[in-house]
Regions:
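Proteolytic processing hotspots in large secreted/extracellular or virion-associated proteins
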Residues: 1-106
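Generic recognition of long tandem-repeat/solenoid scaffolds
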Residues: 61, 67-72, 121-129, 173
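Short domain-boundary/entry signatures in modular proteins, especially
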Residues: 56-57, 136-144
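C-terminal beta-strand-rich structural cap/linker in extracellular carbohydrate-active enzymes
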Residues: 124-140
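Glycine-rich adenosyl-nucleotide cofactor-binding module
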Residues: 118-122, 151-154
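Secondary-structure transition/turn motif
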Residues: 12-13, 115, 127-132
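Extracytoplasmic Gram-positive cell-surface binding/anchoring modules and repeats
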Residues: 140-195
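Surface-exposed loop/edge segments in extracytoplasmic proteins
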Residues: 107-114
Length: 197
C-alpha cells in the first residue's frame, strides 16, 4: 500500500528516508508538500554550543504544506536521516561516541540516542519523529568509579554519551547501586526510541 512505501531524498547535505504514512490524513488534500534539508546558521547558536559542536555539521529540516510552514511531529512514524561525515583521527579511535543532538528553539540540547556513525557510508545516521535542528557531535562521558567493572566501562560510557543512561553525578555512575524500575524504564525507552503514546 502507499503507506508502506518509502521516499528517499538525496542531497549534498544529507539524505532523508520518508515513510509514505508520515503525514496525517488531514493533509491528504494538500496540493504541494515540500521538504528542505539545509545547513543551519551556527552563528545563531550560543557561544558554548558553537564550541561544543565545533566544525561538525548542524542541519535544519523543514516541511511546508501548500507553501506554509508545517510543524511535523509523529511519534509513530520515524524518519531516517543520514549526514555525510568524515571523522577526525581522534573520533575514529572511538567512533561509537559520534552521535546527534536535537537543538530546540531555545538552544537546549536533547540527545538523539539513535545517532551513530556508519563507516560503510561515511555518514552519521539517526531516526527522528519531528523536524528541527540537529547537530553531529562527539561526546565522551567518563565516570571515575568504574574500576570495579572494567568489562562494562566502555558500554556504560557510550550509553551515557548517547543519553540512554545517566550517572548519579557527572563523574559518578555507582555501578554497584540497584536501579529502580523507573530508572530501568527510562533507559529502556531511550534505547528503543519509544514514546508514551
Amino acid at each position: 500500500t502507499a503507506g508502506d512505501a518509502n521516499i528517499k531524498i538525496n542531497t549534498a547535505i544529507g539524505s532523508i528516508t520518508l515513510p509514505g504514512n508520515m503525514l496525517p490524513e488531514e493533509l491528504t488534500g494538500a496540493k504541494t508538500v515540500s521538504m528542505s534539508i539545509a545547513l543551519a546558521d551556527k552563528s545563531k547558536l550560543s557561544q558554548e554550543l558553537q564550541q561544543r559542536i565545533g566544525d561538525r555539521p548542524v542541519i535544519e529540516l523543514n516541511l511546508k504544506v501548500d507553501g506554509k510552514s508545517y510543524s511535523w511531529s509523529n511519534d509513530d512514524v520515524p524518519v531516517t536521516v543520514a549526514i555525510p561525515y568524515t571523522p577526525t583521527e581522534e573520533e575514529l579511535r572511538s567512533p561509537e561516541h559520534i552521535t546527534v543532538w536535537y537543538i530546540d528553539s531555545k538552544g537546549n540540547i536533547i540527545e538523539v540516542p539513535s545517532g551513530r556513525y556508519d563507516p560503510e557510508t561515511s555518514s552519521v545516521i539517526f531516526s527522528i519523529t519531528h523536524f528541527s535542528q540537529f547537530a553531529v557531535v562527539y561526546v565522551t562521558k567518563a565516570f571515575d568509579d568504574l574500576d570495579t567493572v572494567p568489562w562494562d566501562r566502555k558500554a556504560i560510557e557510550v550509553l551515557a554519551s548517547k543519553g540512554i543512561i545517566r550517572g548519579k553525578t557527572e563523574t559518578e555512575y555507582a555501578p554497584q547501586t540497584d536501579i529502580s524500575r523507573a530508572e530501568f524504564l527510562y533507559s529502556l525507552v531511550r534505547a528503543l526510541g519509544v514514546t508514551a503514546s
